[in-house]
Amino acid sequence: MIVGLGIDLAEIDRFEKAQEKNSRFAEKVLTATEFELFSHYTGRRALEFLAGRFAVKEAFSKAYGTGIGQVKLQAVETLNDPQGKPYIKQDLFDGVVHVSLSHTATLVIAEVILERG
């Protein structure tokens, strides 16, 4: 049974401005593992990655029912399986977590579905 659904849309340029304003922005938003992956990218691809990971964190917090203020950014980690499918590693929700992530040239969208039973 679906117990939560969250969607977030992020403008990639907003993350470029945040990085320019604070060079440690990515370190604050990403987990250590996510930051390690982020550091392998440059330019626009790095910004897409950062915006995507943030959007997943936001979407998860909405699905969880608390919003981002109650879920620490470091508590939700998005990784990819060997086929490239994103998945969320977290200890907050006891159930199945589904995640979908997509990009355009200017936007990132993330959807998270929380399921039990």
From Swiss-Prot:
**Keywords, alphabetical:** Cytoplasm, Fatty acid biosynthesis, Fatty acid metabolism, Lipid biosynthesis, Lipid metabolism, Magnesium, Metal-binding, Transferase
Q: Which reaction does it catalyse?
A: apo-[ACP] + CoA = holo-[ACP] + adenosine 3',5'-bisphosphate + H(+)
State the coiled-coil residue ranges.
none
**Which cell locations does it reside in?**
Cytoplasm
Q: Which GO terms fall under molecular function for this chain's record?
A: holo-[acyl-carrier-protein] synthase activity; magnesium ion binding
For the keyword Metal-binding, the answer is: yes
Where, by residue number, does Mg(2+) bind? D8, E58
Q: Tell me, which GO biological process terms does this entry list?
A: fatty acid biosynthetic process
Q: Entry's Gene3D superfamilies?
A: 4'-phosphopantetheinyl transferase domain (3.90.470.20)
One GO cellular component this record assigns the protein to is:
cytoplasm
The EC number(s) given in the record are 2.7.8.7
Family, per the entry? Belongs to the P-Pant transferase superfamily. AcpS family.
What this protein is reported to do is described as: Transfers the 4'-phosphopantetheine moiety from coenzyme A to a Ser of acyl-carrier-protein.
Q: Which HAMAP family match?
A: AcpS (MF_00101)
What is the protein name for this chain? Answer: Holo-[acyl-carrier-protein] synthase
